[in-house]
Amino acid sequence: MMNSSQTLVVKLGTSVLTGGSRRLNRAHIVELVRQCAQQHEKGHRIIIVTSGAIAAGREHLGYPDLPATIASKQLLAAVGQSRLIQLWEQFFSIYGIHVGQMLLTRADLEDRERFLNARDTLQALLDNRIVPVINENDAVATAEIKVGDNDNLSALAAILGGADKLLLLTDIEGLYTADPRNNPDAKLIPEVYDISDELRMVAGDSISGLGTGGMATKLQAAGIAGRAGIDVIIAAGNKPDVISDVIEGNPVGTRFHGLESPMENRKRWIFGAPPAGEIIVDHGAETAICEKGSSLLPKGIKNIKGDFSRGEVICIRSLSGKDLAHGVCRYNSDALRLIAGHHSQQISQILGYEYGAVAVHRDDMIVS
């Protein structure tokens, strides 16, 4: 048993909470709460990222026959979110532990000030021995402001909470060399130090659970958290004492090792914030950014996707679509469209103003 206190984010997907059925599996949730409470009592800090609001809403309303629309999903989430937090509160109260609900959207994470506010709230809950229960605010989130899935949300929560480890609980034991339900020769991959393209291909062929996130989104989450120095473990939610094993460092599931030299807090935000748009760059800019550590100049920009403001985080991509870097843009999308392909000396002439010679400065950039 490790003596030092750890901060652990536990992400529970819909498949874990329902056991693959239409109802929330309360007995299983109680067991997971027992494990969390046990570690909480030992001085560890636990953060819950929970799915299941839509499933809880559907169950509470008696499985209504609703059209498969965004409005119907948001209706179910609005009804179910209160039921879901009541369950967590009820089960943690068995052990005398309070919970605090945090509902987040992408907008809370891509704006630096709101990111810091969310971080301060999360830290205040942890400092007061309250277990944060986090979910995406599905009742109000639109496609433009959704993080997209709770795997990536849990990685962002791990960054917000300064976590040591992120545990992604699912319905299989971890990442396999192939889908174990279709291939009897599939083998569990116990440890990962680098998320290669080959590994992404393996994950892309593997489906996990009934929710929005499969194994591919879990690899995305592992990449985000790993860059911040956070270990990520994918494991089966029904494995006995899985949370204790993760805290104690026992081999379980697939462990993705975080970087030994994690990025500073500002760069954690840059890498963690969902991009507000994309900048497509030419081969020269790609080489300058990836091999020389240079800033992005307007001259190297070929295309801009999306609408974003100055100071927002954007994704820089190659002509082939490869994710090269994330960074804080010094010009808004409209201005970039005007100066793209031009020399920096022409910025003031084209726009009538300038915020410097670069579109994204290397100090405000994280290379992927």
UniProtKB/Swiss-Prot annotation:
Binding residues for substrate: S51, D138, N150
Amino-acid positions noted as binding ATP in the UniProt annotation, renumbered to this chain: K11, T170, D171, T212, G213, G214, M215, A216, T217, K218
The UniProt record lists the keyword Hydrolase: no
GO terms (BP aspect): L-proline biosynthetic process
Enzyme class, broadest EC rank: transferase
Record keywords, A-Z: Amino-acid biosynthesis, ATP-binding, Cytoplasm, Kinase, Nucleotide-binding, Proline biosynthesis, Transferase
Pathway terms, separated by semicolons: Amino-acid biosynthesis; L-proline biosynthesis; L-glutamate 5-semialdehyde from L-glutamate: step 1/2
Domain of life: Bacteria
Primary localization class, coarse: cytoplasm
GO MF terms held by the record: ATP binding; glutamate 5-kinase activity; RNA binding
GO terms for cellular component: cytosol
Catalysed reaction, written as an equation: L-glutamate + ATP = L-glutamyl 5-phosphate + ADP
EC number of this enzyme: 2.7.2.11
PUA domain ranges (all copies): 276-354
Subcellular localization, as worded in the UniProt entry: Cytoplasm
NCBIfam families in the cross-refs: proB (TIGR01027)
Family: Belongs to the glutamate 5-kinase family.
Record function comment: Catalyzes the transfer of a phosphate group to glutamate to form L-glutamate 5-phosphate.
Name this polypeptide is given: Glutamate 5-kinase
Provenance organism: Photorhabdus laumondii subsp. laumondii (strain DSM 15139 / CIP 105565 / TT01) (Photorhabdus luminescens subsp. laumondii)
Gene: proB
